């Protein structure tokens, strides 16, 4: 199993850079940030955006994989996203992973629109978003005429350091999203039970995870892909609780998640208060174990 850390972009860089550098020193396989203008409880608090954060993190680190969980149609057109992704991947020396999701409803998604998207429109936009972003990152010139997105002879020079493009980590819970992950994803991303914001013991997430993994594998078979070629990434966000209560809890959770089919286990950098309250000392103790032999 691979282990990752997600860092809330709330700190000024002189503080944040220490977390990103420490994540690499701790031995995590990948480190992630959020892609929002504001987010939930942080609406009236300090919040920095994903592109400059990842750019700075790319300069600050050397080995660790870097990514966003997740970019969505809420914030930017695929043409602008693709250009930023290519630049960050270059600065990072080919370490970027692009997380993509349909985007949550709420104030973050309506700041620049008069009316919110319907669920159907959001799903349609996400499908076009993934397909167009894929084309923009794979080929030097792209023309695309979709229902929601247009690209007219967009020149993508240079292409990504990683070929044929940066890996996609596609967040999905429904049938259409699972199919997108099966078609385009190097990773499939889940937070456990969809739309659950109340914390629950991590054991309670296992039945949902098993069902979701089964749905992903079915989608892979339907599109003619070997299910084993798609990594399964779990973000332990608000709904999956208790994983950093102790090192024992962390590795117990990792073992249970692995048995459910998860390959990548991402926890939140502990904060002094909710959300994601916890002790950095526990994370440090977990890190001490990461290089030791274990069953997971």
Question: What are the residue ranges of the model-derived segments?
Answer:
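Active-site-adjacent structural elements that line small-molecule/cofactor binding pockets in enzymes
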Residues: 1-296
């Amino acid at each position: 199993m691979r282990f990752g850390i997600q860092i809330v972009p709330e700190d000024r860089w002189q503080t944040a850079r220490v977390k990103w550098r420490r994540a690499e020193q701790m031995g995590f396989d990948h480190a992630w940030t959020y892609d929002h203008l504001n987010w939930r409880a942080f609406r009236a608090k300090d919040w920095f955006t994903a592109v400059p954060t990842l750019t700075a993190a790319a300069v600050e680190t050397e080995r660790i994989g870097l990514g966003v969980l997740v970019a969505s149609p809420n914030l930017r057109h695929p043409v602008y996203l693709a250009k930023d992704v290519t630049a960050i991947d270059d600065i990072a020396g080919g370490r970027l992973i692009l997380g993509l999701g349909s985007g949550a409803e709420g104030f973050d998604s309506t700041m620049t629109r008069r009316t919110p998207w319907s669920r159907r429109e959001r799903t349609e936009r996400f499908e076009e978003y993934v397909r167009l972003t894929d084309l923009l990152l794979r080929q030097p010139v792209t023309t695309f005429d979709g229902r929601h997105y247009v690209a007219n002879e967009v020149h993508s020079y240079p292409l990504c350091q990683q070929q044929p493009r940066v890996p996609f980590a596609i967040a999905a819970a429904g049938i259409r999203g699972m199919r997108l992950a099966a078609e385009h994803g190097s990773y499939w991303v889940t937070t456990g039970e969809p739309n659950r914001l109340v914390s629950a013991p991590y054991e309670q997430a296992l039945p949902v995870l098993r069902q979701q993994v089964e749905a992903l594998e079915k989608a892979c078979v339907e599109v003619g892909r070997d299910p084993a070629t798609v990594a399964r990434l779990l973000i332990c966000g608000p709904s999956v609780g208790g994983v950093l209560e102790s090192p024992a809890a962390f590795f117990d959770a990792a073992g249970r998640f692995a048995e459910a089919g998860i390959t990548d286990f991402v926890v939140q950098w502990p904060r002094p208060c909710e959300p994601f309250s916890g002790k950095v000392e526990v994370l440090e103790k977990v890190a001490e174990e990461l290089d030791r032999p274990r069953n997971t």
